[in-house]
């Protein structure tokens, strides 16, 4: 039986300045001349249609005639962009029935294992915005309880197949990924030009910050455009051997971005979901060789060697299945890498390393060289064990800086150059001693409270690291902000709890990359 019409005659589209995240929302007046409450009662979603174009949206009712007139349907910003029809267009609105794939979600909630076909149907509906946030959360929570290896493989394959899938005309396409959680750590922007300068292809797509003070895309955006489409990205890669672009604009594994938007507020980050997220994007990007950086530390995502081992085996298992050679390295995750935390400060550190400046952060330089060495040794013409020497040669000679400038020129000038925030103050040591620990989560939160990454010039500039001796009253770091209220908030929080542990015990040395 067909669903009855919700509107007669059609309503006209009105754009509402309402950011509803990734969810499509349609708003209708309670006094709509076309609205029949007895028809839509029991339906929380509606289908909007113009000819063959269809949009599913969550239905909301308003009593505010100034917001929506009786002959209009209002579309939130995400819904308006996706429907892509002019304001004033006539649109039919009918009740939308739940996607059939929700039956599989209910089965998963009840403890059943899903087939590949069921998972493919769920991912397809997710990617086409047929699920509400509540329905997405139900799927994520049910999958967090248990996910079999067969389900994981099906999920990775389905997520990679929806959206853009890149192919390249070379058998070796290298990539790197860090699972995150460490402030600074902007190694990708150094590794990519080193590897591309050597001659290996490295088409790098990166994310914007979700819970951190800066993502690679946020930082690179200060130097060049990152919102390239697929064809523009390919042109840059063919010209330069590599790129540094925002993955969200290339539409790789779009279902993953939707899942992440719901995972974060729920603090869901299971190993299986992490692997599905990363590997689906790498599969869609056409990568054949993948290096994954696991920072290990007390406030990192991976806190010990046992966790790292289990996660490594999961990545390698999925990589083997899809023909991607995966190498995992564990790195020092006890503290930030580099000095700057926040887009402007991190871009400064990157260019200082590439430019071989005397004051460039030594830890950022060394970690980048060692990660690049692993990738360079995928080149069959390079003898095993010589990757580090080659990476250092490319950095020291200026070849990596030259390649970075070529990539910047090819991607186009930055649309948003920025300066450091105009408000600044130092956070001081509360006692004499040795820096014995730095809480990465705390430092991340402080930098975000200062306004990063939205305010590009906000963040934290570190003066001390683990093992450094300090005196009471000596600066540990400087807080920058572009807004007075954010500055006051961040500074007060930092003075109350700096994130630094200072005592008289000298911490043990930990290898930067192992």
Curated annotation (Swiss-Prot):
It catalyses: thymidine + phosphate = 2-deoxy-alpha-D-ribose 1-phosphate + thymine. The keyword Transferase applies. Its EC number is 2.4.2.4. InterPro entries: Glycosyl_Trfase_fam3 (IPR000312), Glycosyl_Trfase_fam3_N_dom (IPR017459), Glycosyl_Trfase_fam3_N_dom_sf (IPR036320), Nuc_phospho_transferase (IPR035902), PYNP-like_C_sf (IPR036566), PYNP_C (IPR013102), Pyrmidine_PPase_CS (IPR017872), Thym_Pase_Put (IPR028579). It holds the Pfam family Glycos_transf_3. Keywords: Glycosyltransferase, Transferase. The lineage of its organism: Bacteria, Pseudomonadati, Pseudomonadota, Alphaproteobacteria, Hyphomicrobiales. SMART domains: PYNP_C. NCBIfam families: ARCH_P_rylase, PRK04350.1. HAMAP family: Thymid_phosp_2 (MF_00703). This is Putative thymidine phosphorylase. Coiled coil: none annotated. The keyword Endoplasmic reticulum does not apply. GO terms for biological process: pyrimidine nucleobase metabolic process; pyrimidine nucleoside metabolic process. Signal peptide: none annotated. One of its GO terms (molecular function) is thymidine phosphorylase activity.
């Amino acid at each position: 039986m067909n669903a009855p019409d919700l509107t007669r005659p059609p309503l006209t589209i009105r754009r509402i300045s309402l950011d509803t995240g990734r969810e499509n929302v349609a708003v209708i007046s309670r006094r709509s001349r076309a609205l029949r409450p007895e028809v839509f009662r029991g339906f929380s979603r509606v289908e909007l249609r113009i000819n063959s174009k269809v949009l599913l949206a969550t239905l909301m009712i308003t009593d505010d005639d100034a917001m929506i007139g009786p002959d209009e349907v209002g579309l939130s910003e995400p819904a308006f962009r996706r429907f892509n029809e002019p304001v004033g267009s006539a649109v039919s609105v009918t009740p939308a029935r739940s996607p059939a794939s929700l039956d599989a979600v209910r089965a998963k909630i009840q403890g059943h294992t899903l087939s590949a076909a069921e998972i493919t149907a769920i991912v397809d509906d997710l990617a086409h915005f047929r699920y509400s946030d509540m329905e997405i959360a139900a799927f994520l929570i049910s999958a967090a309880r248990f996910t079999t290896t067969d389900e994981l493989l099906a999920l990775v394959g389905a997520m990679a197949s929806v959206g853009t899938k890149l192919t390249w005309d070379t058998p070796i396409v290298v990539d790197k990924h860090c699972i995150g959680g460490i402030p600074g750590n902007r190694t990708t922007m150094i590794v990519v030009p080193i590897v591309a300068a050597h001659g290996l292809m490295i088409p790098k797509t990166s994310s914007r910050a979700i819970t951190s003070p800066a993502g690679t895309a946020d930082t690179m955006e200060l130097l060049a455009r990152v919102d390239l489409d697929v064809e523009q990205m390919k042109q840059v890669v063919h010209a330069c051997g590599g790129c540094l672009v925002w993955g969200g604009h290339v539409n790789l594994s779009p279902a993953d971005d939707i899942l992440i938007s719901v995972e974060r507020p729920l603090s869901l980050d299971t190993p299986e979901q992490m692997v599905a997220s990363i590997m689906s994007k790498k599969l869609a990007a056409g990568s054949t060789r993948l290096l994954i950086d696991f920072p290990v530390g007390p406030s990192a995502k991976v806190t010990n060697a046992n966790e790292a081992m289990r996660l490594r085996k999961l990545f390698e298992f999925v990589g083997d299945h899809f023909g991607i050679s995966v190498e995992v390295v564990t790195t020092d995750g006890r503290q930030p890498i580099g000095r700057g935390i926040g887009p402007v400060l991190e871009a400064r550190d990157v260019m200082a390393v590439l430019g071989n400046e005397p004051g460039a952060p030594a830890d950022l330089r060394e970690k980048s060289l060692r990660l690049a060495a692993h990738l360079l040794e995928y080149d069959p013409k390079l003898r095993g064990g010589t990757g580090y020497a080659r990476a250092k040669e490319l950095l020291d000679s200026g070849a990596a800086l030259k390649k970075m400038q070529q990539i910047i020129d090819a991607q186009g000038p930055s649309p948003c150059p920025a300066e450091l925030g105009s408000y600044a103050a130092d956070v001081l040591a509360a006692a004499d001693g040795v820096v014995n620990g730095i809480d990465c989560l705390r430092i991340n939160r402080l930098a975000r409270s200062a306004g990063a990454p939205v305010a590009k010039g906000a963040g934290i500039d570190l003066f001390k690291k683990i093992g450094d001796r300090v005196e009471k009253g000596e600066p540990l770091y400087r807080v920058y902000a572009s807004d007075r209220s954010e500055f006051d908030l961040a500074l007060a929080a930092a003075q109350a709890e700096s994130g630094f542990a200072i005592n008289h015990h000298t911490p043990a040395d930990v290898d930067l990359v192992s």
